[in-house]
Amino acid sequence: FAAALAAVHVCAQPPASKPAAGAQVPLQAFLGVLNTNQVAARASLARIRDGWRDAYTAPMLELAGFVPILAVRVEVLAQLEQVTGRHSGGDLNPLYEWLWAREPGEHPDYAEFKAALYEQIDPRFREYFGRERKAIIRLDEIRWGGVWRDGIPPLKNPKMIPAKRASYLADDNIVFGVAIDGDVRAYPKRILAWHEMVKDRIAGRELNGVYCTLCGAMILYDATVGGVHYELGTSGFLYRSNKLMYDHTTKSLWSTLTGTPVVCPLVGKGIELKTLHVVTSTWGEWKKRHAGTTVLSLDTGHQRDYDEGAAYREYFASDRLMFGVPKLDPRLPNKAEVL
């Protein structure tokens, strides 16, 4: 993660010329705030302040976590706190909540800004954004999750074992059960939490199980629509604290919760992945009801701590959110499990 942050910093370069009165501050000025030359970085920030519009809040928030010079980062946060009237304390979520509660408009080059910013972390990220990409969700709600594309590795046709050989599982461990045309399988939460996606052939069908560790949603999709198979992966980005998938062919971003493309050339073409039934159960109850079930082996080809509850243990030990959402429902605590 630290290496990724370092990769964003831009080299010293002459500051962008000051825009004419009433003109938008150019894209170059926003990226200039990341300059490793303090004079140039502060000059870029000054141009943004002088021509400030609320539409600049989104790119400034995305820059805030990457500014390499502490003094400049403090100035960026001060500008954002002044505009929003909120104190961040180093947590950007309250500032994002202010933004999402409004319709501030969008810088005309905002999509290109996201492409230019995040391609410095992973060049493949540019494929998600850019001026020509259609979107049906707010781009300022798409946040980087801190990993590269497929940095959370999916499980592909993983090794399955009979229930009697799964000595690593306790009866109270949580599994996601699938039963299709007599093919019965269990995918332990403790394993999927590290991979967030399993691509498996179940009852002769190529299916994708998508698990979002942060929000706890497990959904099984048939990724073939109209005879076209969409090979899915983990994009590295989230929308409202829920992972966004991407497909290998069009590099579209897909909603995990709806199974539809949300940023891509396919938007508006009626494409929707078919959902299939998944049962969240204890291992003891699942194998009692399905004696012939198979279950994921610990031999995944990856080195992880697959103990129950090990994945994201510190995150789930508090009610603090890693990524904010536009609206919280106070009737339940943050991260409360709902089955």
Model regions and ranges:
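Structural detector for internal amphipathic alpha-helices that build alpha-solenoid repeat scaffolds
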Residues: 14-21, 39-53, 62-63, 71-86
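Phosphate-binding glycine-rich loops and adjacent basic patches that engage nucleotide phosphates
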Residues: 19-23, 36-42, 57, 171, ...
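Amphipathic alpha-helical scaffolding segments comprising HEAT/armadillo-like alpha-solenoid repeats
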Residues: 14-32, 53-65, 88-96
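Mid-to-C-terminal functional-domain signal that highlights helix-capping/loop sites
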Residues: 61-66, 78, 82-339
